[in-house]
Design a protein with these regions (language model features):
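Short active-site oxyanion
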Residues: 32-34, 59, 91-92, 186-187, ...
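Cap/insert and terminal regions of metallo-dependent hydrolase folds
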Residues: 66-73, 79, 168-177, 181-269
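Active-site metal-binding motif and surrounding structural segment of the metallo-beta-lactamase
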Residues: 43-96, 208-215
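Active-site-proximal loop/helix segment associated with metal-binding centers of metalloenzymes
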Residues: 109-110, 131-184
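Conserved beta-strand hairpin/beta-sheet module of binuclear metal-dependent hydrolase folds
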Residues: 2-51, 171, 175-190
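Active-site regions of enzymes building and remodeling cell-envelope glycoconjugates
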Residues: 123-127, 138, 261-268
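Active-site metal-binding loops of divalent metal-dependent hydrolases
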Residues: 8-10, 38-41, 66, 98-100, ...
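Active-site neighborhood of divalent metal-dependent phosphoester bond hydrolases
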Residues: 98-122
Length: 277
């Protein structure tokens, strides 16, 4: 599997690419290509063009969850496909938890997708997945994450609307991740980890049956985090003994320093290319 970072909060020296506070990764695996999230804007299109990546050739877009910094780029992708006359008969799969495109609010401000999922039906085929979904033989969408650790994934972020139209606390149940399975272990890729980074890793291990974690890449939702939670998260990763962690996006410097005492931390930024056999 090859992973290229198209959107992150940071970019690297001498890459001359554009960063924004969001997530978008391009994946190549098993003869297929994917986008994992789409960032806030059209930045991912700009960066993909510079890196020689043709996003019109992707097989699927995978949405980690419905927040705006992961979904708003979908509108720009649809506009781009329209401009290049992408055939509407060859629809791109749009894989997400069923709740991902429900309205989301924080302090009366919309923080969810800027259009309902049906608005993208010209170019995308919606795949609602609450359970595990095989993207390829070796790449899995985890669906709704089990939350068993009592120190994470327990608090709502604003409000959402349920299937009956009632406003409820948003525990971001749509937050998911993907996992690459290989002969030497698993690679876990996250968006924001609102469900809890340790919960995600635990669930990936449960679903795959493989405790050999090669890498965890993405947002860990460790931003202005209490020291007690950081300590428990660091202890978890120390016990996990993963080969490498690539914390980024919603992971602040304090969290990275804490994690560095427990695991091998690697740099992430727009333009980074990671290869896993």
């Amino acid at each position: 599997m090859q992973l290229t970072v198209l959107v992150d909060n940071n970019t690297l020296i001498d890459k001359y690419l554009t960063a924004e506070p969001g997530v978008c990764y391009h994946l190549r695996i098993d003869g297929k290509t994917f986008l994992f999230d789409t960032g806030y804007s059209d930045v991912f299109l700009h960066n993909a063009a510079i890196l020689g990546i043709d996003v019109s050739k992707i097989d699927s877009v995978i949405i980690s969850h419905g927040h705006n910094d992961h979904t708003w780029g979908l509108t720009h992708l649809a506009q781009y496909l329209d401009r290049i006359n992408h055939p509407s008969t060859k629809k791109i799969k749009l894989v997400a938890h069923p709740n991902a495109f429900q309205p989301k609010y924080h302090e009366d401000k919309s923080i969810g997708a800027n259009l309902p999922a049906d608005s993208y039906s010209t170019f995308f085929e919606r795949v609602n997945q609450k359970g595990v979904y095989h993207l390829t033989d070796n790449l899995l969408f985890l669906g709704e994450i089990e939350r068993n650790n009592n120190f994470e994934g327990r608090y709502p972020i604003g409000k959402t609307v349920d299937c009956c139209g009632h406003e409820i606390d948003d525990f971001v149940l749509d937050d998911s991740a993907i996992v690459y399975t290989s002969p030497t272990g698993i690679v876990i890729i996250t968006g924001c980890s609102h469900s809890g980074i340790c919960n995600i890793v635990d669930y990936a291990i449960k679903i795959t049956g493989d405790k050999r974690v090669r890498a965890v890449i993405g947002g860990f939702h460790l931003l202005n985090t209490e020291t007690s939670i950081l300590n428990r998260t660091s202890h978890y990763f120390q016990q996990l003994n993963a080969e490498a962690l690539y914390p980024c996006h919603c992971t602040d410097l304090k969290a990275k320093i804490a994690l560095a005492s427990a695991a091998n931390i690697e740099e992430v930024g727009v333009g980074v290319v990671l290869n896993f056999k």
